Regions:
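Extreme N-terminal, non-catalytic leader segments
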Residues: 1-10
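Phosphate-binding/switch loop-helix module in NTP-utilizing enzymes
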Residues: 87-128
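Single conserved hydrophobic/aromatic residue that forms the stacking wall/gate
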Residues: 137-149
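Conserved lysine of the Walker
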Residues: 21
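Charged helix-capping and loop-helix junction motifs
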Residues: 130-136
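Residues at the beta-strand->loop junction immediately N-terminal to the Walker
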Residues: 13-14
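Anionic group-transfer/hydrolysis microenvironments
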Residues: 18, 45, 122-123
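N-terminal phosphate/diphosphate-binding loop that engages ATP/GTP or pyrophosphate donors
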Residues: 26-95
Length: 149
């Protein structure tokens, strides 16, 4: 059964790092699940860790559930970088590039399975994604997912 609508992706953001986005995302997911909704959380880009998104791990702990199949396949966090800084700098330090289509496709696949996707941003709304755009992700649509700086 497909649940794909523009309205089923909720973007969780804050004004900076360490302002409570991760806890808020986990708590909202837990409340939606308790209300009988099929929900998953997603972190577009995680910096400062290796192999596993620490924020996705925190979401699952708050929700009281184990890692999902989507977590192990990387759909819930398409980009993990080791250096703890803004996504564009962390990608450069790791010698990698952030492809916005990869993030969009991951979100689209989650939308097809879940009633709600809670999409946690990295840092604040205007955190640079690369040298030309930021990840102001206002819609799952590829047309309007970025905003030029």
């Amino acid at each position: 059964m497909s649940h794909q609508t523009k309205e089923n992706v909720l973007f969780i953001s804050g004004i900076d790092t360490n302002v409570g986005k991760t806890v808020a995302t986990g708590m909202i997911a837990k409340a939606l699940a308790k209300a009988g909704k099929k929900v998953i959380t997603q972190k577009m880009i995680q910096t400062g860790c290796e192999h596993v998104s620490e924020d996705i791990e925190a979401h699952r702990q708050i929700q009281g559930i184990p890692f999902t199949d989507e977590d192990t396949r990387g759909l819930t966090c398409p980009y993990i970088f080791t250096y703890p800084c803004s996504p564009h700098m962390a990608a450069a330090k790791d010698g990698r590039r952030i492809d916005l289509d990869t993030i969009t496709q991951s979100t689209r696949r989650l939308r097809e399975t879940y009633e709600y996707v809670l999409l946690e941003g990295a840092g604040g709304l205007m955190v640079p994604n690369d040298m030309e755009s930021c990840l102001l992700y206002t819609s799952p649509s590829p047309r309007d997912r970025t905003r030029s700086r």
